[in-house]
């Protein structure tokens, strides 16, 4: 959490860990590894230096590893896991492997993060920004992964920037209210402008 609040460049950090383990890696190339452990990837099948990063990630973010184990326990005991919004994912054929982990451990680690982000937060943000754009000529025309594409009328550029800034300030509070959770991770919206 501290790194998020301080704006740490996590991709540069990943690059540093892999490079110091003996494999020079650019910040751009390191991006493929930065969040992979969060979504279930391991050091298995990686180079020795890349595997060092995955092991380092688990040691540094022990809370995430503990959460993954909690998800595994829930899936094994109940046959499902839940996202913070209450969306459930069933694992009817789950089994425990010899190493103690569930048979679908990667999916178990991936679903709560990806689902909450792409099935809940992104659409929620889209609807909120659409509401803030009401009465304007500018409009949302598409969403791609975690990005919203807004067709901005030239006369409304500053207004749309203000809408994004307002959404940025309110989003966490609205998420907490919507799902009655303590969502204490800042969501920082970037605003990039280009010709169409």
Q: PLM features: what roles do these ranges have?
A:
Residues 1-196:
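Conserved catalytic core of nucleotide polymerization and phosphodiester-bond processing enzymes
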């Amino acid at each position: 959490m501290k790194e998020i609040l301080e704006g740490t460049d996590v991709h540069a950090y990943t690059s540093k860990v892999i490079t110091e383990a003996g494999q020079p890696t650019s910040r751009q190339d390191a991006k493929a590894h930065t969040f992979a452990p969060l979504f279930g990837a391991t050091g298995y099948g990686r180079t020795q230096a890349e595997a060092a990063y995955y092991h380092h990630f688990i040691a540094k973010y022990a809370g995430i590893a503990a959460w993954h184990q909690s998800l595994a326990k829930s899936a094994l005991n109940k046959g499902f896991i839940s996202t913070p919004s209450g969306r459930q994912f069933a694992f009817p054929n789950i089994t425990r492997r010899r190493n103690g982990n569930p048979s679908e451990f990667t999916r178990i680690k991936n679903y709560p993060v990806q689902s909450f982000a792409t099935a809940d937060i992104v659409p929620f943000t889209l609807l909120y920004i659409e509401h803030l754009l009401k009465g304007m000529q500018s409009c949302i025309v598409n969403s791609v992964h975690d990005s919203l594409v807004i067709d901005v009328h030239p006369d409304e550029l500053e207004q749309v920037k203000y809408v994004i800034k307002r959404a940025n300030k309110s989003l966490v509070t609205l998420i907490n209210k919507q799902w009655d959770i303590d969502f204490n991770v800042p969501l920082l919206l970037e605003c990039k402008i280009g010709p169409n």
